[in-house]
């Protein structure tokens, strides 16, 4: 990855992000939105980018990559990465850890997960999203979220981040990621993302209704 490529992809990512965020905030769409089924969601991934390289920027300063990217310490340092989230942490997966990057200015977070439909990755959604969000608050930060292939576990955690901290629906999050990298979470992870989507949509609708009720109450006051 050259610095020129990074700058170009970064410039292209911002307009895309700006186009998506208002869509989630539109009241009409928020009321009508219904979480699609697994097959419909998979079709969104298939319609996405065929691009599948070692690492791709999917959101400003946020990258999804594979094991080779995570193990290339020189490449990470040269590209300016400051944070690494390993979604395949552990001895039998991508065995890096904080010690692997101890001589580098990299903050590490590990998630010990298996790429199996029966594995409950949802318990890591909020901690992983919090790590990503905290990393992106730094002006010059650059975070790599990876697993073994950069297609399922890492993509799932990035999607959860966009839903939790960027107020995206699952559909908008998939479109944002899939247009920049070829990814496809397994069916079990998709089911968990669907459940998260339903919860977040319900919370946002509840907050919207409470806000509307508060405004009406304020209007009635003399």
UniProtKB/Swiss-Prot annotation:
Subunit structure: Homodimer. Interacts with PRKAA2.
Enzyme class label: hydrolase
Taxonomic source organism: Sus scrofa
Compositional bias of kind Basic and acidic residues: 209-222
Function: Dual specificity phosphatase able to dephosphorylate phosphotyrosine, phosphoserine and phosphothreonine residues within the same substrate, with a preference for phosphotyrosine as a substrate. Involved in the modulation of intracellular signaling cascades. In skeletal muscle regulates systemic glucose homeostasis by activating, AMPK, an energy sensor protein kinase. Affects MAP kinase signaling though modulation of the MAPK1/2 cascade in skeletal muscle promoting muscle cell differentiation, development and atrophy.
EC code: 3.1.3.16, 3.1.3.48
GO biological process terms, semicolon-separated: muscle cell differentiation; negative regulation of ERK1 and ERK2 cascade; negative regulation of MAPK cascade; protein dephosphorylation
CC terms in the record's Gene Ontology section: cytoplasm; nucleus
Domain Tyrosine-protein phosphatase, first and last residues per copy: 54-202
Protein's recorded name: Dual specificity phosphatase 29
Active site: residue positions: 147 (phosphocysteine intermediate)
Similarity comment: Belongs to the protein-tyrosine phosphatase family. Non-receptor class dual specificity subfamily.
Reactions listed under catalytic activity: O-phospho-L-tyrosyl-[protein] + H2O = L-tyrosyl-[protein] + phosphate; O-phospho-L-seryl-[protein] + H2O = L-seryl-[protein] + phosphate; O-phospho-L-threonyl-[protein] + H2O = L-threonyl-[protein] + phosphate
GO molecular function: MAP kinase phosphatase activity; protein serine/threonine phosphatase activity; protein tyrosine phosphatase activity; protein tyrosine/serine/threonine phosphatase activity
Domain of life: Eukaryota
Disulfide bonds: none
Sequence positions that bind substrate: 146-153
Coiled coil: none
Annotated region described as Disordered, given as residue ranges: 201-222
């Amino acid at each position: 990855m050259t610095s020129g490529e990074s700058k170009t992809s970064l410039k292209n990512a911002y307009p895309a992000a700006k186009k998506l965020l208002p869509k989630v905030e539109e009241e009409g769409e928020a009321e009508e939105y219904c979480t699609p089924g697994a097959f419909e969601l998979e079709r969104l991934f298939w319609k996405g980018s065929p691009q599948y390289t070692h690492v791709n920027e999917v959101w400003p300063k946020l990258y999804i990559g594979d094991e080779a990217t995570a193990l290339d310490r020189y490449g990470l340092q040269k590209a300016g990465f400051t944070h690494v989230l390993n979604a395949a942490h552990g001895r039998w997966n991508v065995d890096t850890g904080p010690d692997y990057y101890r001589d580098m200015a990299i903050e590490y977070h590990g998630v010990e997960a298996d790429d199996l439909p029966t594995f409950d990755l949802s318990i890591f959604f909020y901690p992983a999203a919090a790590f990503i969000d905290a990393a992106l608050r730094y002006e010059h930060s650059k975070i790599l979220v990876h697993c073994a292939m950069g297609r399922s576990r890492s993509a799932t955690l990035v999607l959860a981040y966009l839903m939790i901290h960027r107020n995206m629906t699952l559909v908008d999050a998939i479109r944002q990621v899939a247009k920049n990298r070829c990814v496809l979470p397994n069916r079990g992870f998709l089911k968990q993302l669907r459940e998260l989507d339903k919860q977040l949509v319900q919370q946002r609708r509840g907050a919207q209704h409470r806000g509307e009720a508060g405004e009406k109450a304020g209007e009635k006051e003399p």
